Curated annotation (Swiss-Prot):
InterPro entries in the record: Ribosomal_uL4, Ribosomal_uL4_dom_sf, Ribosomal_uL4_euk/arc_CS, Ribosomal_uL4_euk/arch, Ribosomall_uL4-arc
Statement: the UniProt record of this protein carries the keyword Amino-acid biosynthesis: no
The protein's name in its UniProt record: Large ribosomal subunit protein uL4
Gene of this entry: rpl4
Source species taxonomy: Archaea, Methanobacteriati, Methanobacteriota, Thermococci, Thermococcales
Function (record text): One of the primary rRNA binding proteins, this protein initially binds near the 5'-end of the 23S rRNA. It is important during the early stages of 50S assembly. It makes multiple contacts with different domains of the 23S rRNA in the assembled 50S subunit and ribosome.
């Protein structure tokens, strides 16, 4: 399968053969598992001190005294201690660091999930279903010349994105940036930001600096490409711009 390569003016200049990875069957189940596994590996285990609430010298006076048979401190006023309902007592079911919080996925399954997510970027129906605005995008997958890697000015990338037909999707991402409900906005997560186009390059020669200020835009090299970037929120079909060098590197990695 051949695809057109566009220059920075949005004009086709040549055709190249797509690697076989773009013919991978669509596997949303594996993509979802791979994304969730990536999420869980960022969770930090938490626990409580095993001796919290137990550092008291207590005694149980037993029955027959007309008072509850709970552990009490030895010195007056002999408050209840140690038990969960006492002041300073232990917690009932505290979190434990031994809890298994990671979800694993086999290496071959993770590789297949990434390949399937890459193939999904070439399916216009999946890209539209994900919510991207692609009315002016000339081709799927959208492949551009390697000169894009050297653009380091935000104003220049804005004009390039307009000519490539992806600026409408960046404006959609800007409109959908909302203030988060709840206390998360007081904890460094004030804004919920929509995901816009993904730019995949063979080598960063300035494009990260030139594109990072556009709302929703992510830039990544092929070697660091992961399923979370290709399918944010477990939803495959992200609008993706590939450079010619990135396509050639894909052939080396995935065939």
């Amino acid at each position: 399968m051949k695809v057109k390569v566009f220059n920075l003016e949005g004009e086709p200049v040549e055709e190249i053969e797509l690697p076989k990875v773009f013919s991978t069957p669509f596997r949303p189940d594996l993509i979802r598992r791979a994304v969730i596994a990536s999420w869980t590996h960022r969770i930090q285990p938490q626990g409580r001190d095993p001796l919290a609430g137990k550092r008291r010298v207590t005694e149980n006076i037993g029955k027959g005294h007309g008072m509850a048979r709970v552990e009490r401190i030895k010195t007056p006023p002999r408050f209840a201690a140690f038990v969960p309902f006492a002041r300073g007592g232990r917690r009932t079911h505290p979190p434990k660091v031994e809890k298994i919080i990671w979800e694993d996925i086999n290496k071959k399954e993770r590789r297949l999930a990434i390949m399937s997510a890459i193939a999904a970027t070439a399916n216009p129906d999946l890209v539209r279903a994900r919510g991207h605005v692609v009315d002016n995008v000339p081709a799927f997958p959208l492949v551009v010349v390697d000169d894009l890697q050297k653009v380091f000015k935000t104003a220049q990338t804005r004009e390039i994105f307009k000519k490539l037909g992806i600026w409408d999707d960046i404006e959609r991402a800007k409109r959908n940036t909302k203030i988060r409900a709840g206390k998360g906005k007081m904890r460094g997560r004030r804004y919920k930001k929509a995901k816009g186009p993904l730019i995949v390059v063979a080598k960063n020669e300035g494009i990260v600096q030139g594109a990072r200020n556009h709302p929703g835009v992510d830039v990544v090299t092929v070697d660091n490409l992961g399923v979370e970037l290709l399918a944010p929120g477990t939803h495959p079909g992200r609008l993706t711009i590939w450079t010619k060098g990135a396509i050639e590197r894909l052939k080396e990695i995935y065939g």
